[in-house]
């Protein structure tokens, strides 16, 4: 036992963080234009004058942040962040990297708390948490390489012989092409799939019925033995969500994902109504 502890201490001494590098990679090739009502977006209700161009601006992935955490024993862990990569790079370079250089990657909980607490005044969500996540992923990647084990082993190991998965695409599109895409997933053997709903509060009652058409179209193709889910990307208001959920109730969805902005659940009296 004493030898084992000595070995663990030796590993900790060798696995100190010596550098943290953040780099933004930018896509410079052609970009396919996103059509109107591709998917709902939380910014829709404030972008009325230019909604067709701005509908999906908050989720465009034309840049990508990659974080490298290098250890004293020569391992390099990789992490990444897709949303707001440029601001996240600034957070990593200015706040996170100086705070964790010299720490052992095996003290990962201490490192996480250190990053979180040093960004608490302006962090706690958004860019701050995204930057912390990118570094945290890189640390776990370095841990796996150092231990010569896949990270899932370090997190507790296998609990099942296999895991269910679902097809997650089915963005709003003409109904015939939506049906074809759903049929392709059935042919591939998927027993669950998730679609995106393209209309929100600014589209009124007509948009509600268009959302229902999307769901009914997919359901008619996949049948009742396939789980069906829908994602809204926080594009609805409380009032709209309540009205839509009454219409959706008969469509046998397994879940409705992110109907409203999550933090509003803690500040609005309507939260209990939506939950019920």
Predicted features by range, described:
Residues 1-7, 11, 266-276:
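Single conserved hydrophobic/aromatic residue that forms the stacking wall/gate
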Residues 12-72, 82:
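Structured beta-strand/loop patches that form or line metal/cofactor-binding pockets in enzymes
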Residues 54-55, 70-146:
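Metal- or metallocofactor-binding catalytic centers and their adjacent structured scaffolds
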Residues 59-60, 157-159, 221:
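Solvent-exposed alpha-helices and their adjacent loops that cap or buttress functional pockets
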Residues 81, 137, 142, 195, ...:
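Generic detector of well-ordered alpha-helical packing
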Residues 127, 136-168, 172:
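Glycine-rich, aromatic-flanked loop segments that form ligand/cofactor-binding clefts
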Residues 162-265:
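Metal-dependent enolase-superfamily TIM-barrel catalytic cores that perform enediolate-based chemistry
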């Amino acid at each position: 036992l004493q030898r084992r502890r000595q070995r663990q201490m030796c590993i900790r001494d060798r696995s100190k963080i010596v550098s943290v590098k953040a780099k933004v990679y930018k896509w410079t090739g052609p970009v396919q234009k996103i059509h109107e009502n591709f998917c709902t977006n939380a910014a829709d209700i404030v972008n009325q004058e230019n909604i067709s161009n701005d509908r999906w601006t908050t989720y465009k992935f034309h840049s990508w942040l990659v974080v490298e955490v290098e250890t004293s024993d020569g391992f390099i862990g990789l992490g990444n962040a897709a949303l707001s990569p440029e601001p996240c790079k600034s957070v990593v370079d200015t706040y996170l990297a100086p705070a964790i250089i010299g720490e052992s990657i095996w003290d990962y909980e201490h490192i996480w708390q250190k990053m979180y607490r040093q960004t608490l005044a302006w962090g706690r969500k958004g860019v701050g948490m995204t930057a912390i996540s990118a570094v945290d992923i890189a640390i776990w990647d370095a841990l796996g390489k150092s231990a010569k084990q896949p990270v899932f082993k370090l997190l507790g190991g296998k609990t099942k012989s296999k895991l269910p998965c679902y097809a997650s695409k089915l963005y709003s599109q003409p109904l015939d092409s939506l049906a074809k895409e759903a049929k392709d997933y059935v042919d591939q053997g998927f027993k669950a799939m998730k679609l995106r709903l393209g209309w929100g509060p600014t589209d009124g009652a007509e948009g509600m019925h268009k959302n229902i058409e999307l769901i009914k179209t997919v359901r008619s193709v996949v049948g009742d033995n396939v789980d069906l889910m829908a994602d809204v990307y926080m594009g609805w208001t409380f009032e709209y969500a309540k009205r839509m959920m009454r219409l959706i109730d008969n469509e046998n969805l397994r879940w409705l994902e992110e109907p409203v902005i999550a933090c509003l659940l803690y500040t609005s009296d309507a939260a209990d109504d939506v939950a019920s």
